[in-house]
């Protein structure tokens, strides 16, 4: 980055936490030499070292993190080391485990007699009456295949005109996803892919979810939201929402006809899919800011329902985190930024599609680069003490300036202490 660019970056992104006299005290290591990462580390005057050297801060891939925390590695971190993933992040980011944890969370709340687990009867499009959760119905009905195949067939037959979406559990960026509207299509795929629906025979797990076939459309096109959520602790739960998320649009107008069922440019919003389409626009990258979405909805639907929608999105994020908190390895050296993918239906109800433990830091447009640079800058400001040097003994209570574009979603420690703090508890209290 040249000197002029550095000046612009400084004015755009605000303060640099680390005092000049201490800027060389931090050694960083990374597997992902993305420009938004490297420029943030360099701006702080950090020194790059290798994984076998004495590092303070490691921005690692999920594979490196798993290897580092494995019993075989024998590696033990000291108080001045931090890493950007929790050891078993996959409890949230693997599609099958996320579903399992949310189902367990609901059952536990039911056993406790919690009002959160209240249910009500719902009439399906085909006229069938089913029971659904009132407050925790934020994930489309989902089954893990092959284990839940018989349960899936039972649910499918309740509403045979429904469309379902099939996804491999451990893959991302739209890989291996397809839609079905007939059991015969699923069976045909099983034969051709040589993936039998038998728990002992299948080598790979899939999730199959009821497809949200009534998405909110803008300009006739389907979109989803990518929101960034920073977790600094799971027990007690402490999480922040980045306010500069974005919408990702399909390049082709939405069409529910059977002939378009296999057209992924109609149904999948992933940039990795859409950028190969003939209608992809490399200037805006098929993206719109969440702030512009809010303004659009306030103008077309009204402020009250828009506020309700955004509150509902925060609600589903918090409860998805609460669902996995009991099983997460809560290592004090760790923090993690998750990419939440959410679809809004035409009734303005948000649905959680999936959670990514390694949201892309590749910049596809100028605005993308600005947003992701600021995301990394703000993450570093939140997870590091005021002097900018990693220290796990720090109480992880960043001040308002350090939050940047993050807002506190939940801090269970503050709730438990019942200490009002600059209005923060008021924002948290609904998640008790």
Regions found by a protein language model. Give the residues of each.
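Catalytic core of tubulin tyrosine ligase-like
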Residues: 151, 155, 159-337, 347-350, ...
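Conserved aromatic-histidine-acidic binding/catalytic patches
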Residues: 25-29, 86-90, 215, 305, ...
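A short, surface-exposed helix-loop junction/capping segment
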Residues: 14-22, 78-81, 288-303
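Glycine-rich phosphate/pyrophosphate-binding beta-alpha loops
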Residues: 356-364
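Polybasic/polar functional segments that serve as interface/processing modules
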Residues: 281-284, 419-432
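Conserved N-proximal alpha/beta basic substrate-recognition cap immediately N-terminal to
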Residues: 6-18, 24-172, 179-185, 191-192
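A residue-level signal for conserved active-site and pocket-lining positions in enzyme catalytic cores
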Residues: 41, 98, 142, 208, ...
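A short beta-strand motif that forms the metal-chelation/ATP-contact edge
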Residues: 342-344, 349-357
């Amino acid at each position: 980055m040249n000197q002029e660019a550095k000046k612009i970056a400084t004015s755009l992104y605000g303060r640099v936490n680390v005092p000049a006299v201490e800027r060389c005290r931090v050694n960083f290591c990374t597997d992902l030499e993305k420009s938004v990462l490297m420029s943030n580390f360099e701006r702080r005057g950090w020194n790059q070292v290798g994984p076998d050297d004495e590092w303070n801060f490691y921005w690692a891939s999920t594979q490196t993190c798993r290897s580092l925390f494995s019993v075989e590695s024998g590696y033990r971190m000291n108080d001045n080391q931090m890493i950007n993933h929790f050891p078993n992040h996959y409890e949230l980011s693997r599609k099958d485990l996320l579903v399992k944890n949310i189902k367990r969370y609901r059952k536990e709340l039911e056993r406790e007699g919690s009002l959160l687990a209240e249910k009500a009867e719902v009439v399906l499009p085909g006229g069938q009456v089913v029971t659904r959760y009132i407050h925790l119905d934020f994930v489309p009905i989902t089954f893990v295949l092959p284990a839940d195949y018989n349960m899936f067939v039972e649910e499918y037959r309740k509403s045979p005109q429904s469309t379902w979406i099939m996804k491999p559990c451990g893959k991302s960026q739209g890989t291996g996803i397809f839609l079905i509207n007939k059991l015969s299509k699923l069976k045909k795929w099983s034969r051709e892919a040589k993936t039998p629906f038998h728990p002992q025979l299948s080598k790979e797990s899939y999730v199959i979810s009821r497809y949200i076939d009534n998405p909110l459309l803008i300009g006739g096109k389907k979109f989803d939201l990518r929101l960034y959520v920073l977790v600094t602790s799971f027990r007690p739960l402490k999480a922040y929402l980045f306010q500069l998320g974005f919408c990702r649009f399909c390049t082709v107008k939405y069409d529910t006809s059977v002939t378009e069922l296999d057209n992924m440019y109609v149904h999948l919003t992933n940039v990795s899919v859409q950028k190969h389409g003939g209608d992809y626009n490399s200037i805006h990258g098929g993206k719109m800011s969440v702030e512009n979405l809010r303004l659009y909805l306030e103008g077309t639907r009204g402020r009250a329902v828009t506020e309700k929608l955004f509150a509902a999105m925060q609600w589903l994020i918090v409860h998805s985190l609460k669902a996995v908190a009991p099983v997460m390895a809560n290592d004090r050296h760790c923090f993690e930024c998750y990419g939440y993918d959410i679809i809004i239906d035409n009734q303005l109800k948000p649905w959680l599609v999936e959670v990514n433990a390694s949201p892309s830091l590749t910049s596809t447009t100028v605005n993308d680069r600005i947003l992701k640079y600021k995301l990394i800058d703000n993450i570093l400001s939140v997870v590091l003490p005021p002097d900018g040097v990693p220290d796990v003994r720090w109480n992880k209570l960043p001040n308002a300036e350090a939050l940047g574009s993050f807002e506190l979603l939940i801090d269970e420690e503050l709730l438990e202490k019942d200490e009002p703090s600059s209005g923060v508890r008021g924002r948290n209290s609904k998640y008790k």
